[in-house]
């Protein structure tokens, strides 16, 4: 793949990902259904435990009624057991249909090969395109494989955001008592809007930094696949008994040693990827993590200040902190996933370039119309008869 073909707009990237997801659904609908079911279930269930735990803590800090505490604890334990049971079933369903996913993807590509006109199949450009798709798939999973991972993450983060927001809205609408004096300013809509704006800005900034780090791997896709080819050949050359004589006569083990033991290899300590990790990629990822900690600090301070003034009880603190940090991680994950989808789009474009190769030759059967004004002549060549 040419490195100058890396720039794809977000709109086109989303269209390519959506088309790829529909392609999966056409071939493997139960795989998609099992994936979505487990994703939604895993996104919703944490909030059930958060809510029930908050009720237990609130009761322990309040009336301390033994009957109510016993009831809440029983409900929490039964809910946890039920969630675990259903999760195990959904995971088994998904694992069953996800087994051999690499072969499932290759089936989609191979069906196109079998359906292709021979002149296109025999074209070296077609086979180079197919080989490039397979290499990117076998390496970092670029192309169709990452589509499933990205949509799973996007679906999970989306439902998690919806549930989290429904539990955190009251955090910003709850009023601080007027006896709190200076902290009453937190009731001001302008102050609340400013705090939300800062949280949104931090939430957006963190995954954007992580996305910039991910772009370095896209730029290195050609080197990645080339290094995999070198390793696949020279790393196993010594085990090929058919080439053992050539290895000894021409001392080819020195060539293998050069490629297998060199620390300048892209995957080794002095290679390109190591330099990325020590340089720009490491910087962007560290900055992304630092920004996420800033958000956590702001969330804790805001929630604890409102609880300190008596806006809500200790149980609500647990609920709000858990929910708001969950919303933050989900929004960050959603933005990060969209960045990954845009990075993956260039490889999907390559895949669909292969799948969209037209079949110009006629496929099927042609009938010959028999007419009285036409004379047909049938000639047999190299025909034998057996009685």
Protein language model regions, located:
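Juxtamembrane/interface segments at transmembrane-helix termini
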Residues: 88-101, 206-226, 333-346
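Membrane-integrated ABC transporters
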Residues: 1-45, 64-72, 90-94, 126-162, ...
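Hydrophobic/aromatic residues in alpha-helical transmembrane segments
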Residues: 49-56, 90, 94, 109, ...
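Transmembrane helix-loop-helix hairpins at lipid-water interfaces of multipass membrane proteins
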Residues: 33-86, 160-214, 305, 309-314
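Hydrophobic alpha-helical interface/terminus motif in multipass membrane transporters
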Residues: 53-57, 113, 213, 217, ...
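Cytosolic ends of transmembrane helices, especially the final helix of ABC transmembrane type-1 domains
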Residues: 299, 318-357
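Extended non-transmembrane interhelical loops and adjacent amphipathic helices
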Residues: 1-18, 99-145, 226-274, 345-358, ...
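Conserved A-loop
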Residues: 382-386
């Amino acid at each position: 793949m040419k490195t100058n073909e890396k720039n794809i707009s977000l709109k086109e990237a989303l269209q390519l990902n959506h088309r790829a997801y529909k392609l999966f659904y056409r071939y493997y609908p139960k795989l998609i259904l099992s994936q979505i079911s487990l994703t939604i279930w895993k996104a919703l269930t944490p909030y059930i435990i958060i809510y029930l735990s908050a009720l237990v803590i609130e009761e322990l800090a309040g009336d301390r009624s033994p009957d109510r505490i016993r009831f809440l604890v029983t409900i929490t334990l039964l809910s946890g057991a039920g969630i675990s049971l259903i999760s195990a079933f959904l995971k088994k369903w998904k694992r069953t249909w996800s087994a051999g996913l690499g072969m499932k993807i290759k089936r989609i590509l191979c069906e196109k090969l079998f359906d292709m006109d021979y002149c296109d199949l025999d074209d070296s450009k077609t086979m180079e395109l197919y080989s490039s798709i397979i290499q990117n798939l076998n390496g970092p999973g670029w192309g169709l494989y990452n589509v499933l991972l990205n949509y799973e993450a996007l679906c999970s983060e989306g439902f998690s955001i919806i549930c989290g927001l429904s539990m955190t809205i009251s955090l910003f609408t709850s009023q601080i008592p007027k006896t709190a004096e200076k902290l009453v300013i937190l009731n001001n809509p302008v102050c609340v809007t400013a705090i939300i704006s800062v949280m949104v800005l931090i939430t957006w900034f963190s995954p954007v930094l992580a996305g910039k780090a991910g772009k370095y791997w896209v730029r290195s896709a050609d080197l990645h696949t080339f290094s995999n080819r070198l390793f696949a050949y020279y790393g196993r050359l010594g085990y090929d008994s058919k080439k053992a004589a050539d290895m000894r006569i021409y001392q080819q083990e020195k060539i293998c040693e050069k490629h297998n033991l060199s620390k300048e290899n892209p995957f080794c300590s002095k290679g390109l990827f190591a330099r990325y990790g020590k340089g720009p990629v490491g910087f962007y990822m560290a900055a992304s993590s630092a920004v996420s900690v800033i958000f956590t600090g702001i969330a804790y301070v805001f929630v604890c200040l409102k609880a300190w003034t008596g806006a809500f009880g200790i149980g609500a603190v647990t609920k709000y902190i858990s929910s708001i940090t969950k919303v933050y991680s989900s929004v960050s994950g959603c933005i990060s996933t969209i960045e990954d989808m845009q990075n993956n789009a260039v490889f999907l474009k390559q895949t669909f370039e292969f799948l969209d190769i037209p079949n110009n030759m006629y496929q099927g059967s042609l009938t010959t119309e028999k007419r009285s004004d036409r004379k047909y002549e049938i000639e047999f060549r190299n025909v034998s008869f057996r009685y």
